[in-house]
């Protein structure tokens, strides 16, 4: 029953949709609303969200605006990149990885303020509704989850605008605001809707907000060195930085050199296909560099097992199962594999390309020049290969002698 909810924590951006939701919750549920606005690097000024919430009657003590950039990168982005996680071969999971953190903090604020409900602005067609709500139920299953898009009759843009106008909610589009449905954080920007709903329609060049076109990138390449400790980047060109600082700097470098644009059609967890365009400049560099440092610090068995586990791990994140036992189990295995992933990777950035120029590890290098040299060596006896090959061929030999044809 709607009257059973007394206080609701709303994931609030300050935009039109969540402002309408705020007013709708007050009107339909007759409840007190707590707004939570997370700074996860979306690059927008967040204080206007406070003014809008106040204008809609939210008490000052019920307005939470928090900088979660360091926590986002340290506890969510970096663990995911230790796994080299990619969904369906291309998507670096920029939206997927942000939702668990926002939902977790909502549940924590609910406990802090004595709220008995939570709400979000995700629509009934997308993956985000699943990601938010699975996180809510994992953290506090006693919270009432309110999803306006699955309840109200404001099912068109015209109805939403009429409701906003009726209730004095500002519907003025900010100058320079993209007409596309966008999601932005420190890892990526995504674009959906409008002409992108036709998968055969190329995106306009002025849609991209972050990365320059590779054609317009500098004609001179840039070489950087990324330092790694236990699988996480910790420095750029020898300068130690915090997780958020690392990603911010890699974003700047990647965007400048036209790195990180992506146009794909993905399979949503809810069953439909969706076309989206993404900009992930820093993440694109991190993925390539991390695989490079792993190539000399992980043994073959560990590296291959990680590659086998990665699609399942990526799917769990995409589908919203960040707080699931199976994701935590996989994370423990992945983190164990990173204990010796230490060293430096030299990377060249040039017109949309990330090229590995070198990789080194002072204490954890498994690349042995003594064993792999093409020159004469004294540590490897080629005759040992004879028995190795025969043992591996034994099943073929037996099958062939029994008349099996291959």
From Swiss-Prot:
What name appears for this protein in its UniProt entry? Argininosuccinate synthase
The biological process GO terms on file are: argininosuccinate metabolic process; L-arginine biosynthetic process; urea cycle
Q: What is the lineage of its organism?
A: Bacteria, Pseudomonadati, Campylobacterota, Epsilonproteobacteria, Campylobacterales
- Record-listed E.C. numbers: 6.3.4.5
HAMAP family, per this entry?
Arg_succ_synth_type1
> Which InterPro entries has this protein been placed in?
Arginosuc_syn_C, Arginosuc_syn_N, Arginosuc_synth, Arginosuc_synth_CS, Arginosuc_synth_type_1_subfam, AS_cat/multimer_dom_body, Rossmann-like_a/b/a_fold
Q: Where in the cell is it found?
A: Cytoplasm
One Pfam assignment: Arginosuc_syn_C
Q: How does it assemble?
A: Homotetramer.
Identify the species of origin.
Campylobacter curvus (strain 525.92)
Positions of ATP binding? 11-19, 38, 121
Q: Which GO terms describe its molecular function?
A: argininosuccinate synthase activity; ATP binding
Listed A to Z, the keywords are: Amino-acid biosynthesis, Arginine biosynthesis, ATP-binding, Cytoplasm, Ligase, Nucleotide-binding
Asked if Ligase is a keyword of the record, the answer is yes
Q: What class of enzyme is it?
A: ligase
């Amino acid at each position: 029953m709607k009257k059973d909810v007394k206080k609701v924590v709303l994931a609030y951006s300050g935009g039109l949709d969540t402002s309408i939701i705020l007013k709708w919750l007050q009107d339909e549920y007759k409840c007190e609303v707590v707004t939570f606005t997370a700074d996860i690097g979306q690059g927008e000024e967040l204080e206007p969200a406070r003014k809008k919430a106040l204008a809609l009657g939210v008490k000052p003590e019920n307005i939470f605006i928090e900088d979660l950039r360091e926590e986002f990168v340290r506890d969510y982005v970096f663990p995911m990149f230790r796994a080299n996680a990619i969904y369906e071969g291309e998507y670096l999971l920029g939206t997927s990885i942000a939702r668990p953190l926002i939902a977790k903090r909502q549940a924590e604020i609910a406990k802090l303020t004595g709220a008995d409900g939570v709400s979000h602005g995700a629509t009934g067609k997308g993956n985000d509704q699943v990601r938010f709500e699975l996180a809510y139920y994992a953290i506090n299953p006693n919270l009432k989850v309110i999803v306006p898009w699955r309840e109200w009759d404001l099912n068109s843009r015209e109805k939403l605008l009429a409701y906003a106008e009726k209730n004095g909610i500002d519907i003025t589009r900010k100058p320079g605001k993209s007409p596309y449905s966008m999601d932005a954080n420190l890892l990526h920007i995504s674009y959906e809707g409008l002409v992108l709903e036709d998968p055969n329609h190329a995106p306009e060049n002025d849609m991209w907000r972050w990365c320059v076109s590779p054609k317009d990138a500098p004609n001179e390449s840039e070489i950087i060195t990324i330092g790694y400790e236990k699988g996480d980047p910790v420095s750029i060109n020898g300068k130690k930085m915090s997780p958020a600082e690392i990603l911010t700097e890699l974003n700047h470098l990647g965007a400048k050199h036209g790195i990180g644009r992506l146009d794909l059609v993905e399979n949503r967890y809810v069953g439909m296909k969706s076309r989206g365009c993404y900009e992930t400049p820093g993440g694109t560099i991190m993925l390539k560099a991390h695989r490079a440092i792993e190539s000399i610090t992980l043994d073959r068995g560990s590296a291959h097992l990680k590659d086998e586990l990665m699609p399942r791990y990526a799917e769990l994140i995409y589908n919203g199962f960040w707080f699931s036992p199976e994701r935590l189990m996989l994370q423990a295995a992945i983190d164990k594999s990173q204990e010796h992933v230490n060293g430096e990777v030299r990377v060249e950035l040039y017109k949309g390309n990330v090229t590995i120029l070198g990789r080194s590890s002072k204490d954890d290098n498994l690349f042995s020049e003594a064993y792999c040299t093409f020159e004469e060596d004294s540590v490897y006896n080629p005759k040992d290969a004879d028995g190795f090959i025969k043992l591996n061929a034994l099943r073929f030999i037996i099958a062939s002698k029994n008349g099996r044809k291959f």
